[in-house]
From Swiss-Prot:
One of its GO terms (molecular function) is CoB--CoM heterodisulfide reductase activity. The heterodisulfide reductase is composed of three subunits; HdrA, HdrB and HdrC. Part of a complex that catalyzes the reversible reduction of CoM-S-S-CoB to the thiol-coenzymes H-S-CoM (coenzyme M) and H-S-CoB (coenzyme B). Keywords: Methanogenesis, Oxidoreductase. Pfam families: CCG (PF02754). This is CoB--CoM heterodisulfide reductase subunit B. The gene is hdrB. It is an enzyme of class 1 (oxidoreductase).
Length: 305
């Protein structure tokens, strides 16, 4: 019988990148997990924005989402750094602060809900690394991510901020200054993870920067793309739809703000999409054609187009 997890979709994935959702569902089914929909779930809400304006409102909304998973009786899986950061930190605060928990439950009682602190929030990166394991992922690979010349696909991984820090809350396995989990997960698919300058730098999108100061946010993105290409990457992969949007849409937006641009576009994949390809799934199943940056160059290198 498949193990069950509550699947927290967030906002960006279902609205902008449904292929990430499809890939995640397919990959987890292949790994022996059933992802259960959280009917009625709202925005996480975004920690850097909502939390900075009104901590109690932010944590109350997050607690409502947590209570939906508690009602179903399964831990939560997120595929977005922001959603993970919000739900996981709210869970931590409510378990550590009785006064805050009492306040939140008074509010939730008005809609016949209660936060009980009985579920754990997992990020897809950490769940795959610790709960599933690199060994099992390797065993599921039917089509290693190798180019037609026999060389492994070169992938530049992007971790993102809320996955790593604050480390005392995220529970990230290993060093947050020199993380390796996503690198190992990528290499389990038969690809090569390439090191590059400023690897753990922000993509530029978070904290409201993208919506408020787009050019500032794109400075980060442009620098990261330059660094990834310099390292010889064929593509970049991430574990967050917001980071994904910043790299995917951001490469299109750069031309409106900068004269000096990266020498070429770098295709962008969520990790579950790369895993789907390695597990033998068709590119069409993973909705790669919905990305802003054409993924065809990578598919051609893999002999899939």
């Amino acid at each position: 019988m498949a193990k069950k997890l509550c699947f927290f979709l967030g906002c960006i994935m279902p609205n902008r990148y449904p292929g990430i959702e499809k890939a995640t569902r397919l990959v987890f089914e292949e790994l022996g997990y059933e992802l259960v929909d959280m009917d009625g779930a709202s925005c996480c809400p975004a920690p850097g924005v909502f939390g900075s304006f009104d901590l109690k409102t932010w944590v109350t909304i997050a607690a409502r989402n947590l209570s939906i998973a508690e009602e179903k009786g399964y831990d939560i899986l997120t595929v977005c750094n922001g959603c993970f950061g919000s739900l996981n930190e709210a869970n931590h605060l409510l378990q550590e602060n009785p006064e805050l928990r009492e306040f939140v439950n008074e509010k939730l009682a008005e809609i016949d809900r209660e936060y009980k602190g009985k579920v754990k929030v997992y990020h897809v990166n950490t769940f795959l690394y610790e709960e599933v394991g690199v060994k099992k992922i390797k065993e599921k690979v039917e089509r290693p991510l190798e180019k037609t010349d026999g060389e492994p696909l070169k992938v530049a991984v992007h971790y993102g901020c809320h996955l790593l820090k604050p480390s005392e809350v995220t529970g990230f396995p290993g060093s947050v200054e020199d993380p390796r989990t996503l690198d190992e997960l990528v290499e389990a698919l038969g690809a090569e993870s390439v090191d590059y300058k400023d690897k753990i730098m922000c993509c530029g999108a978070g904290g409201g920067v993208r919506s408020r100061e787009l050019k500032v946010s794109l400075h980060f993105t442009r620098e990261k793309i330059f660094n990834m290409l310099e390292a010889g990457a064929d593509c970049t992969t991430n574990v967050c739809p917001f980071c994904h949007l910043q790299f995917d849409r951001g490469q299109i937006e750069m031309k409106e703000h900068f004269e000096k641009l990266p020498p070429k576009k770098l295709p962008v994949f969520h990790y579950c999409q790369l895993a789907g390809l390695a597990f033998g799934m068709d590119p069409e199943e993973l909705a790669l054609e919905t990305h802003e940056i054409d993924c065809t160059p990578v598919l051609e290198k893999l002999g899939l187009a």
